[in-house]
Amino acid sequence: IHTTPGHEYHEYFETNIKGAENICNFARENNVVTIIFTSSIAPYGAWEEEKTEDSLPLPTSAYGSSKLVAEEIHKRWQAEKPNERKLIILRPGVVFGKDEGGNFTRLYSAMNSGRFFYPGRKDTKKAVIYVKDLAHLMVEMAEKEKPGVHLYNTVYAPIHTIEEICKTMAKVTGVKEPKITVPASVLKIGASTICGIGKLIGKSFEGIHPDRVKKLMISTNINGQKLLANGYRLNFSLEEAISDWYKDSNLKELK
């Protein structure tokens, strides 16, 4: 589970911590010496400041906290045989690709229907990566890296704003580029009101929550330069990635 908010607080820890323990125990029992752990940028927390791999993690959600603990569980496994075991921790931004049914699919659908507007601002920075680039990096790192602990932010560098992402989406797919920006105060009041009504009538409105609205307006300002500095290259630019994703996707599912 990774949708936040969306689950009970304890569910994030049950899933991510027990999952990490199970993986490490399996690796011990089967003499596995390489683990690639897909963490998240959530351990950095929701802050506007740029974050590098050296930044102090300050998670602001149960998901981010549980992922950070899971990283430490994997580090403990590696430390048992530091000269033999290889741990690669990846902190990807929003991952998009065929059948992901997530942020990019929802963005396309909203833009295609003319319902998308910029939430609060246009310059929100959003860390993203194409699934094919992420998979390629995993294979390359597994082959290249030596025993030890290796941490990488897996995001496009330089980072893109939500406006740049929307303009690229419009250019590649032919949907209309959004022009309207709705003030943050209006969105917060609207989300709070709808959630309040939902509680009164016992109904949940999927995707509408004050915390989620706030999340939309905060940058995920993640620095991906370490990848480049260590010789790794992404095969797709943002435009190429969206174009490839669009061609791979079932257009009926996107509408």
What are these regions, as identified by a protein language model?
Residues I1-K18, N22, Y44:
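NAD(P)H-binding glycine-rich loop region in Rossmannoid oxidoreductase-like domains
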Residues E21-A62, I88:
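Conserved Rossmann-fold NAD(P)-dependent oxidoreductase catalytic core, especially the SDR/UDP-sugar
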Residues L58-I88:
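Active-site Tyr-X1-5-Lys
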Residues G97, P119-T124, Y152-I159, A170-T173, ...:
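Glycine-rich Rossmann NAD(P)(H)-binding loop
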Residues E100-R106, G120-E143, V149-N153:
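Substrate-positioning beta->alpha
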Residues V131, K167, G190-Y232:
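Conserved C-terminal active-site "lid" loop/helix of NAD(P)H-dependent oxidoreductases
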Residues M141-G207, S243-Y246, K252-K255:
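Mid/C-terminal beta-alpha module of Rossmann-like enzyme folds, strongest
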Residues I222-A229, R233-K255:
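Amphipathic terminal alpha-helices
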